A protein has these predicted regions:
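A short acidic, Gly/Pro-enriched loop at the edge of an enzyme's catalytic core
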Residues: 129-138
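Conserved SAM/SAH-binding beta-strand->alpha-helix loop
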Residues: 100-101
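Conserved class I S-adenosyl-L-methionine
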Residues: 68-77, 166-192
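Conserved alpha-helix/loop element of class I SAM-dependent methyltransferases that forms part
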Residues: 51-69
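A short glycine-rich, Lys/Arg-flanked "PGG" loop and its adjoining helix->strand segment in the class I
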Residues: 151-166
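Conserved SAM-binding strand-loop segment of SAM-dependent methyltransferases
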Residues: 114-127
Length: 223
């Protein structure tokens, strides 16, 4: 899940990373790449040019978080959203969750360097975020389509949500010229169906991201 997302970010940023990617690392069974050089990939993920289409500040403002909110950024990588959220929520807590150990270590080191005591790096599993505490919001950016058993994943994730918590899913839309192959993308309507099967209802849909859809969910009966 996480390794493939790295390759997609390289595509989304104009192929910067793919030119340097070790082709021998690809698995014919998983179609994944191994990208252990977090320092290198930080330059790709955190390229300032990404801001123009990812619109991180507008995304965070749209989430309408309380000042002491607890947030999980699942698929956090080198901290593109996690670090911004930690700065935005000095009285809150942010869990950056990733399944790649090198990314987990990189984010933990980055949090220490930047003095972000409210940012905790978590080593998740492909089928479990392994959150240490319950949260008010889960943010997943270009991660949902990598999860193999999404209904089971979100049913388990529901156990880590505070009452009234929300799940925000941002992923590549069908029109985007960058991102995963069309066959691997998950259409918004399918996301809504799968989330409903996992016990969630659609709260809202936002349309300001040029390459991605942006959906928010809440457990049925909550709110």
């Amino acid at each position: 899940m996480r390794a493939l997302r790295i390759a997609l970010w390289a595509l989304a940023l104009g192929g910067i990373g793919l030119a340097c990617a070790p082709a021998q690392a690809q698995s014919p069974h998983t179609h994944m790449h191994s990208f252990s050089g977090a320092e290198h990939w930080a330059r790709v993920f955190d390229d300032p040019e990404r801001d123009a289409w990812q619109k991180p500040h507008q995304v965070i403002e749209t989430l309408a978080l309380g000042p002491d909110a607890a947030v999980a950024d699942i698929g956090s990588g080198t901290g593109y959203f996690s670090v911004r959220l930690a700065h935005f929520l000095p009285k809150g807590r942010v869990y950056g969750v990733d399944v790649e150990p090198d990314m987990v270590k990189y984010l933990a080191d980055r949090a220490r360097r930047e003095g972000l005591r409210n940012l905790i790096s978590v080593n998740g599993a492909p089928d479990d975020a392994r959150l240490p505490h319950k949260v008010d919001l889960v943010l997943m950016v270009d991660t949902n389509h990598h999860i193999e058993r999404r209904e089971a994943y979100f049913r388990k994730l529901a156990q880590s949500l505070n009452p009234g918590a929300r799940v925000a899913i941002i992923d590549f839309n069908a029109q985007s010229e960058t991102g995963p192959p069309p066959a691997e993308r998950v259409a918004p309507a399918r996301v809504v169906e799968e989330m409903a099967a996992a016990g969630f209802r659609l709260l809202g849909e936002h349309h300001f991201l040029p390459r991605q859809y942006f959906l928010t969910f809440q457990l049925k009966g909550a709110g």
